[in-house]
Design a protein with these regions (language model features):
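Sec-dependent N-terminal signal peptides
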Residues: 4-15
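Conserved beta-strand position repeated across blades of beta-propeller domains
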Residues: 32, 70, 126, 171, ...
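Short coil/turn segments that connect the beta-strands within blades of beta-propeller domains
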Residues: 35-36, 74-76, 130-131, 175-177, ...
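A flexible loop/linker signature enriched in serine peptidases of the S9 family
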Residues: 42-47, 61-66, 79-91, 95, ...
């Protein structure tokens, strides 16, 4: 008996060790919380885990994505946006798991994708009560920027529009008589620090008086209102990084509650006693009683079938093609690699054969000896050249560019390459010496239009003025000076 007990203890020890050594999951999206239960989207499926962390349990496994889960007020049901039937619709599922039930039916949109900057259609926002799910839909809008808020009965009845012309993320007051909401929806945009006309505020709409009040009134992005008691919580980047703030509806006092300075808080949601959110790909919950954040350390056991090596037909993903000067071969860009293909007969070659590296903008040198391309093997955009047949390792020409390179142009003598970048610069490099020379830098728009002279001694380019009116300039490589070739307006 003692030996059996010892064996069991050893097995339990190694099992616990295996779980403890399981790598912590990252890139968990769109979390929700109720009590001790957390639900989130990972690799397009829904998972649930205790807020203390641990091994997550998978709730959904459909081919499409399941995103934006939200607990009902009683915590018994999860509403989410899914693609079980091809279209993006609202579904409900028991909080402990089960068969999803579809509760909305809308027409398919041309722009309905998780990666689209407009975001997907029919996103679950919140619940009004245990019988109605609030979702944002573009089904009535002619403009991809605009969407309205709708109530979907959980019994599958017809949805009704909340009486607002447009709407984004929102939250009801505890008595259900008011709604804190964003008028604009731009949470899927890819740029930061926006403060223009579409920078949003948090507004409160009174269903009785029909009045709307701006409670943030700030040039920054104030988004994701979450109403709990007398306090409306929201995100703001008024201090450059998205952090959690609160607005007390009784005292009209605004407080900053978190102090992240690296990654933004993203996609928070309100539970019964906590707010959960993404930060740097991890999950954290903010306890409303103690006003403190806690990380949820999650492990996920999944086969990750989609990440296994697969055979792909590169011909279906060609993004550019350039024939050789003699017309005998063509270089194609596809799936981040560069291919050399014979015009009539011969061998097709993958010239780069890199994994996890994006090579693009491939082109032949005018003499046909070299192929140049832009690659990010170093983590930055750099310009490379390689022998036309791929017989030698590529040569990295530029170093530490630190920005995005739009494209480049070979000089007719095949001795230099000019390029422009997101820093609004036009530069060229001497291939033999590797010396980089800056031709010009704009204070206004980008310098994307430029051409070499036939003798490779001049560069002609257009440069925008402050009013975006362009002039043509000529740059002499010998004396390194530019002069305008056209008049100012």
């Amino acid at each position: 008996m003692k030996r059996i007990f010892t064996t069991i203890c050893v097995i339990m020890f190694f099992t616990a060790s295996a779980f403890s050594q399981q790598e912590e999951a990252r890139l968990m999206r769109f979390p929700a919380i109720y009590g001790d239960q957390v639900v989130f989207s990972y690799a397009g499926d829904l998972f649930t885990v205790d807020k203390s962390g641990g091994l997550a349990r998978q709730l959904t496994s459909a081919e499409g994505v399941e995103i934006f889960p939200r607990f009902s007020p009683d915590g018994q049901t999860i509403a989410f946006t899914g693609q079980y039937d091809g279209n993006t619709e609202v579904f409900i599922i028991p909080a402990e798991g089960g068969v999803p039930e579809r509760i909305t039916y809308t027409a398919t949109l041309s722009r309905d994708n998780l990666s689209d900057r407009m975001g997907p259609n029919n996103i679950v926002m919140t619940w009004k009560d245990n019988d109605h799910v609030v979702y944002r839909s573009r089904k009535k809008s002619f403009n991809d920027f605009q969407g309205q808020l709708f109530l979907a009965p959980v019994d599958g009845g017809i949805s009704t529009q909340i009486p607002l012309p447009t709407g984004g993320f929102c939250s009801y007051s505890p008595d259900g008589k008011k709604l804190a909401f964003n008028r604009v929806f731009r949470e899927f945009r890819t740029w930061k620090y926006y403060s223009g006309g579409m920078a949003d505020d948090v507004w409160i709409y009174d269903f009785d008086t029909k009045e709307t009040v701006n409670i943030t009134n700030n040039d920054a992005q104030d988004i994701f209102p979450m109403w709990h008691g007398d306090v409306v919580y929201f995100l703001s980047d008024r201090d450059r990084t998205m952090n959690l703030f609160s607005y007390n509806t009784a005292t009209q006092e605004t407080k900053k509650l978190t102090n992240y300075d690296n990654f933004d808080i993203k996609f928070p949601s309100l539970g019964d006693n906590a707010i959960i959110y993404e930060n740097g790909g991890y999950l954290y919950y903010f306890d409303l009683a103690t006003q403190t954040p806690t990380k949820v350390e999650v492990q996920i056991m999944k086969d990750f079938a989609a990440s296994r090596p697969q055979w792909k037909d590169a011909s279906k993903s060609i993004n550019s093609a350039y024939p050789s000067p003699d017309g005998k071969r063509v270089v194609f860009g596809s799936r981040g690699d560069i291919f050399s293909v014979p015009a009539s007969s011969g061998i097709t070659k993958n010239l780069t054969k890199t994994s996890g590296v994006h090579e693009r903008n491939q082109d032949w040198s005018p003499d046909g000896r070299w192929i140049a391309y832009i690659g990010d093997a170093t983590g930055e955009n750099e310009i490379y050249i390689m022998k036309h047949d791929g017989s030698e390792e590529p040569i990295q020409l530029t170093k530490n560019t630190g920005t995005y390179i739009f494209g480049y142009e070979w000089s007719p003598d095949s001795k230099k390459i000019a390029w422009s970048d997101q820093e609004k610069r036009l530069q060229y490099i001497d291939i033999d010496s590797k010396k980089v020379t800056e031709v010009d830098q704009s204070n206004s728009g980008e310098l994307r239009n430029y051409e070499w002279s036939p003798d490779s001694k001049w560069l002609a380019y257009t440069k925008p003025s402050f009013e975006e009116v362009t002039r043509i300039y000529l740059y002499n490589l010998e004396n390194k000076t530019s002069k305008p070739a056209t008049d100012e307006w």
